[in-house]
């Protein structure tokens, strides 16, 4: 799964 940064 693609990595989504927590912003």
Curated annotation (Swiss-Prot):
In-chain residues carrying the UniProt-annotated modification Valine amide: 7
Gene Ontology cellular component annotations, sorted alphabetically: extracellular region
Keyword Secreted annotated: yes
UniProt keyword list: Amidation, Amphibian defense peptide, Pyrrolidone carboxylic acid, Secreted
Location in the cell: Secreted
Main location: secreted
Residues the record lists as Pyrrolidone carboxylic acid modifications: 1
Expression sites by tissue: Expressed by the skin dorsal glands.
GO biological process, alphabetically ordered: defense response; positive regulation of smooth muscle contraction
Cited function: Induces contraction of intestinal smooth muscle in isolated guinea pig ileum.
Stated family: Belongs to the frog skin active peptide (FSAP) family. Peroniin subfamily.
Name of the protein in its database record: Peroniin-1.2
Organism, scientific name: Litoria peronii (Emerald spotted tree frog)
């Amino acid at each position: 799964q693609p990595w989504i940064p927590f912003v």
